[in-house]
């Protein structure tokens, strides 16, 4: 409560959920999003400090708004150089929560210099949580459902595609246009399923009466 929290990519499903939790506990929210439409949506949620995630200048802007202090917590889902910029806005003794799996799988190296400020780095993978600590997972899920029942949390916005339009769904996702989640439905069945493509195998043939180098 009272901590300054930076939510990176706040218009996605995880980001919107994080905003709801942050407002519930009384955190001061700083958020980034990649389009005007997404930033307008965050304003509708009551977020005041909003920055462009497509520009690395957001770090300098956050430091300017906080008088050079930065934030207490970073909730990150971006890969590459954005990680280093997020470290720059983290206060001493701050917490860095890493949600993006891309850097995990690619074994991206993280410089140790920021850690001289006594910061903590947490890699978060819900799959591992369910696998290693199923009892904790069930307890957390029950607590979350109770918050929905109390009206503290609300369902996320989503954009639906029919299963037969799965290609369009992937294109939409690649354009990074979605706010919230993308949902695939089967209301009308799969009517345009593509037949499997047979891959022909051609063998090489060499005339016996020829020479080759």
Residue spans of the language-model regions?
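4′-phosphopantetheine-dependent carrier domains
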Residues: 1-192, 199-213
């Amino acid at each position: 409560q009272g901590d300054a929290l930076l939510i990176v990519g706040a218009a996605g499903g995880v980001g919107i959920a994080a905003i709801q939790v942050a407002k519930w506990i009384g955190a001061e929210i700083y958020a980034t999003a990649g389009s005007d439409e997404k930033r307008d949506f965050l304003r509708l949620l009551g977020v005041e400090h909003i920055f462009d995630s497509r520009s690395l200048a957001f770090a300098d802007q956050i430091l300017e708004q906080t008088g050079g202090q930065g934030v207490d917590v970073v909730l990150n889902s971006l890969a590459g150089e954005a990680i280093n910029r997020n470290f720059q806005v983290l206060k001493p003794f701050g917490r860095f929560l890493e949600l993006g799996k891309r850097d995990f799988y690619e074994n991206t190296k993280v410089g140790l210099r920021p850690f001289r400020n006594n910061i903590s780095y947490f890699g978060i993978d819900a799959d591992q949580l369910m696998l290693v600590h199923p009892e904790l997972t069930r307890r957390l899920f029950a607590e979350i459902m109770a918050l929905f029942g109390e009206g503290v949390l609300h369902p996320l916005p989503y954009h639906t595609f029919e299963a037969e339009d799965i290609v369009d769904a992937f294109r939409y996702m690649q354009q990074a246009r979605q706010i919230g989640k993308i949902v695939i439905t089967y209301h009308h069945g799969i009517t345009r399923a593509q037949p499997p493509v047979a891959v022909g195998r051609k063998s090489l043939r060499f005339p016996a009466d020829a020479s080759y180098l």
